Amino acid sequence: MKKLTVARLGRTVGLHGDMKLHILTDFPEQFQKGSTFESDRGSLTIESVNPARGTVKFQGIDSVDEAKKYTNAYLYSDEETTKKSFPLGEDEYFWFDILGCDVFEEGKRLGKVVDIQRLPAGDYLLVETDKSFVDMKKAKSFLIPFLDMFIEDVHLDQKRIDTKGAQDILEAS
């Protein structure tokens, strides 16, 4: 089961073990009293959370010294839990499902999605270009806006994304 990074713990706040919570997910509602997360330093169960202040307190961590041991620790969920807890609508996808998909246009493989970059204008797929295009001196990677005008179809069962206009972006890169 693959771990998904959902948050990073920051500095301590106050005297009772509260910590800054830096949320790294599109689903902040998962941070509720009683929720348990794995961290790179052990399991942590939320005792309280204050979204307005961006802080969290965990059960059994009641002092600044105890909390400092978790500064910069990452909190993890997993794909299965995320899919169960947060059902998506039509034409909505989890990033972890999109990563690793092959990108095609008119039957030609353009490359593979290796990352998703969130930019002010929207989400972009970072595509590692197929060797056949790199051999023709094209860019080793390029960005495709995740918009209807470029994305024709997403076939998660085949790990395949069909595009239109993406080859033009590659050619211009």
From Swiss-Prot:
Alphabetically list the UniProt keywords: Chaperone, Cytoplasm, Ribosome biogenesis, rRNA processing
Cited function? An accessory protein needed during the final step in the assembly of 30S ribosomal subunit, possibly for assembly of the head region. Essential for efficient processing of 16S rRNA. May be needed both before and after RbfA during the maturation of 16S rRNA. It has affinity for free ribosomal 30S subunits but not for 70S ribosomes.
User: What family does the database annotate?
Assistant: Belongs to the RimM family.
Give the protein name, as stated in the record: Ribosome maturation factor RimM
Record text about domains: The PRC barrel domain binds ribosomal protein uS19.
Q: What is its main location?
A: cytoplasm
Q: Name one Pfam family in it.
A: RimM
List, for all copies, the residue spans of the domain called PRC barrel: 90-169
Write one Gene Ontology MF term: ribosome binding
State the Gene Ontology BP annotations: ribosomal small subunit biogenesis; rRNA processing
Which species expresses this protein natively? Nitratiruptor sp. (strain SB155-2)
* Protein location: Cytoplasm
Annotated Gene Ontology cellular components are: cytoplasm; ribosome
**What does the annotation say about its assembly with partners?**
Binds ribosomal protein uS19.
Tell me the InterPro entries matching this sequence.
PRC_barrel-like_sf, PRC_RimM, RimM, RimM_N, RimM_N_sf, Transl_B-barrel_sf
